[in-house]
Amino acid sequence: LIPVTHTSANGLPLGSEADHSYRKILFFDCGLMLRLLGITTGDTTTLATQILTSTAADLVNKGTIAELVVGLEMLHYMPPNLRHELYYWVRLSKNSLAEIDYLLPSHLQILPIEVKAGSQGGMKSLWSFMREKHLTEAIRCSLENFGSFSHTDKEDRDTARHVSVIPLYAVSQIIKITTSDRV
């Protein structure tokens, strides 16, 4: 089991504001998770592949499985000389629900990563988090092809915000982005 720890994400390092009483847990294997969910019909590897390519029947847990795959793949591609910790953010307010699936340090900034199990879905939590934390870059990992979204935030002095889209099959690119040297 791999913990993903809540952080307030007000700056780096992300662990400095970690709240270990709020954690999401990743199973170390998709097949094991599907088995525990009682989804045992046929080959679970094939089922996981179908889920991530949107050819499987619509499952309630599809988003959770996509988050699991992204988390495990990010850990797999992290350089071995770095400490492997995953963080997420959630607004802990009774009247407002917002969550960012993963946060990574990238070039002395926080990089929010939103995971979507399909090719559509709103990004209200992502835009809100970026505004609150004064960030201009983020990643959306989904079934979409490579692409990007730009947004001029009228509520924050017309700040330009940019979201890069990375397909679920290319999660390794996220780690390349966060660890590459900028020119």
Report residues per predicted region.
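Short, solvent-exposed loop/turn segments at secondary-structure junctions
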Residues: L32-M33, G118, N145-F146
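Arginine/glycine-rich "motif VI" loop of SF2 helicases in the C-terminal RecA-like domain
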Residues: P79-P80, F129-T136
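Short beta-strand/turn micro-motifs composed of small residues
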Residues: R140-S142
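Conserved catalytic cores of phosphodiester-cleaving nucleases, focusing on short active-site segments
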Residues: V70, M74, I100-S119, A138
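Domain-level recognition of nuclease-like catalytic cores that cleave nucleotide substrates
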Residues: F146-V183
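Accessory nucleic acid-recognition modules appended to NTPase machines
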Residues: L1-A98, L104
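Short, solvent-exposed amphipathic alpha-helical segments in soluble enzyme
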Residues: G42, S128-E132, E155-D156
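Active-site-adjacent loop/helix micro-motif of nuclease/hydrolase catalytic cores
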Residues: G118-S128, F149
